[in-house]
């Protein structure tokens, strides 16, 4: 994924009303840009943070600019535009860059499914194997106190994410393949686990999903201000495998 036209940069002034962000440009001008991320954005949205934003050519947009990248105090690049996770996952699957998801004849997006009025992010289909239902989640939360690059999901309580896990378990029970794909969009994260300290219910549901046969994949693309490209999978640490008292 190449950012075209190239991203422009500035300094974060404030994020407010969830979707709005004020950015000061190098010439001193302050502009308001759109923020697609509705999460807590812990460690990504401190005033003074260096940010990069894209510009839409759509004249009907009220806010033509969108916040794409933040640079952490440690120099890590973080893609904060949650829509990019789905876009990049689709690109990588179409490029056969994600080995566990290769070999399907068709890929569809936003297909209605399940019993809770859901739409699956990605649906892989083939005439010779069960369909593969993929929910994509964007991971940007790094615990800066840890030196081992531990990332967490979610960064806030997520009832929507819980619904998606229930739907995936139902698809698996119906004989399909079900995958929870974490797209790790923080260059400082090298492994991850459920954020039981933030959303214990979601963490419990992940354990139930694993037991039910839902696959957990964590993929970390290379995140930069010019592009995001294929890199590697990273380990996922299930909470029930952690030593007692480690949370």
UniProtKB/Swiss-Prot annotation:
The organism's place on the tree of life at top rank: Bacteria
For this UniProt entry, the molecular function terms from Gene Ontology, in alphabetical order, are: DNA binding
Per the UniProt entry, the disulfide pairs are none
Supply the PANTHER family for this chain. Answer: SUGAR FERMENTATION STIMULATION PROTEIN A
In the record, the note on similarity to other proteins reads: Belongs to the SfsA family.
Q: Which HAMAP family does this chain map to?
A: SfsA (MF_00095)
Which protein is depicted?
Answer: Sugar fermentation stimulation protein homolog
The scientific name of the source species is: Aeromonas hydrophila subsp. hydrophila (strain ATCC 7966 / DSM 30187 / BCRC 13018 / CCUG 14551 / JCM 1027 / KCTC 2358 / NCIMB 9240 / NCTC 8049)
Taxon lineage: Bacteria, Pseudomonadati, Pseudomonadota, Gammaproteobacteria, Aeromonadales
Gene name on record?
A: sfsA
